[in-house]
Amino acid sequence: MPLGVVVRPGRGRADYPPAVEHLIRVADEVRAALSEERPVVALETTLVAHGFPAPTGVEVGLASEAAVRSAGAVPATIGVLDGKLVIGLTESELGRFGPDARKLGPRDLAACAVQGAVGATTVGGTLAAAQTVGIRFMGTGGLGGVHRGFPTPPDVSADLGACARIPALIVSSGVKSLLDVGATVELLETLGIPVVGYRVDTLPLFYAAEGGPPVSARVDSADEAARVADAHWRLGGNAVLVGRPPDESLDVADLIEAIVAEAHDRGIVGQAVTPFVLAALHERSNGETRRVNRDLIVANAGLAAEVAVAYAAL
């Protein structure tokens, strides 16, 4: 296959232009899968570094990879290490992603690589990295979006910008629980990003299986999701968000609202908000939110793999 050529929309490629070769390292397993046009699913490292305390973060990352493999796809966990964007981290490399790792959106990848720092990719950062080799499927917990209180401050996740630019399918349990869900869905519509419910008619509210805004379409199988994504991309579309509800619902909406208000009162802003909210939720729910969070992340990775496998068979 010629260098840098995508054989059909979303199939992926085994190589990348020589100009970026010194910045990217692709694991042999991932490279082989892309070369053979087998399904590959991207996984982020922010969940490993900042979503859970050590060693739970690594355990969740490995469980997500196992779920991808069980569904018949190849996992590609992404992060920045030793001056390179690594697509397909090893287990020992995952162990280097702790709370001191930089949190990388699309804008941060280059500086982190050049400066030789350890960088954990967000959804947006993972999508940007995955795009360099043509990976179009990703599983995660929740998408970033519009923070509560917008426009004071005007805080909107770079995940949405990446979704607006990059043709990819992301499986999540809706958007992050601390966000303004309604405003985020409105912005997704403005950006032309389909919000697809997996066997549900409303967007999951991360910890809760239902109760969010209506989705733009519903699918009832991985094959149907793959066909919707294929048609969307053939028509020139960008990302597709597939909302998979958690298997177990928690009613923590009031608790989240109180913790978000506390973060605001304490002057916690930007990338520091999510870790603060997650830690407080864990403490005040007696560990229930962290358990549900772990389970939905792994399940979403598995569904992303099922959709990737179905897409490869189209």
Q: At which residue positions do the language-model features occur?
A:
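Active-site glycine-rich loop that binds ribose-phosphate moieties when present
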Residues: 122, 151-164, 168-189, 220-227
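Glycine-rich nucleotide/cofactor/substrate-binding loop typically near the N-terminus or early
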Residues: 45, 50-52, 57-112, 234-248, ...
